[in-house]
A protein has these predicted regions:
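Acidic donor-binding/catalytic loop of UDP-sugar-dependent glycosyltransferases
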Residues: 58, 98-112, 182
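Short aromatic/hydrophobic "clamp" motif used to bind/position activated sugar donors
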Residues: 93
Length: 243
């Protein structure tokens, strides 16, 4: 496991497998690989695994050595993440969205957090800042700090054995990251958070502040329905109507 360029030192004491689910990400995958090219993993063995869910836009052809490309097994994002985890060799699994921009020293911060706890995430900030997105950003970071609930766009890193002990991500069309965080809480495993933030795209939000607020509120309602017993399949149907 390699991929080392002496520009930024990771200083993470454990081997890390970065797992990135992709589906038609030709517009983002080059920029993410460029980020990895600039990182020196400082002797901590690291691998990057792209898990493709059937891209048709040329995403597969853009993956370059030494990064790995494998085909997804199972359905949904949870299936992609689990496929990557099973193929990974690292002591730490780092699940990352393809449109993410890591802060400087990201792997060093992963090591710092994992010296205190067994699972962690990054604080989040959006690439575009509007009043609604700033509110969403603040609430997301407070949710991790006080409720130990993290979502996929924040970048989750976890010790490999704990990931499998927690049951992996559920094979469901929606809420896989939310349910996994709940599983960790039941195991008594708090999610730590880095000092610096990961930057993520606001592309899941529509244009216009009113529409952004509507999506944010409706997503909170979907999570509330899930906690009360609604099935992920039922919520997935509703999800398409709230964006």
């Amino acid at each position: 496991m390699s991929a080392r360029v002496a520009v930024e030192s990771s200083q993470c004491p454990k081997s890390v497998s970065v797992i990135v689910p992709v589906f038609n990400e030709v517009s983002t995958i080059d920029a993410l690989q460029d980020q990895f090219d600039r990182i020196d993993f400082a002797g901590s063995r690291c691998e990057v695994i792209f898990v493709d869910g059937g891209s048709t836009d040329g995403t597969r052809d853009r993956v370059r050595a030494p990064y790995r490309l494998i085909d997804q097994e199972g359905r949904g994002r949870g299936g992609a993440l689990n496929t990557g985890a099973r193929a990974a060799e690292g002591e730490v699994l780092f699940f990352l969205h393809c449109d993410s921009v890591l802060p400087e020293g990201a792997f060093r911060e992963i090591g710092e957090v994992l010296s205190r706890t067994r699972v962690g995430t990054f604080g989040i900030r959006f690439s575009k800042l509007t009043p609604v997105l700033m509110l969403c950003q603040v609430m997301s970071n407070l949710r991790v700090r006080f409720r130990h609930i993290s979502y996929g766009d924040q970048g989750l890193f976890i010790e490999r054995d704990l990931f499998f002990k927690a049951g992996m991500f559920p094979d469901v069309p929606l809420m896989e990251d939310f349910q996994f965080a709940l599983n960790l809480k039941r195991l008594g495993e708090p999610i730590g958070m880095t000092r610096h933030r990961i930057r993520t795209s606001a592309r899941r939000f529509p244009n216009g502040e009113v529409d952004r607020l509507r999506v944010w509120v409706n997503m909170a309602r979907l999570r509330s329905r899930y906690v009360k017993g609604a099935s992920p399949e039922e919520l997935a149907l509703a999800y398409g109507n709230v964006r």
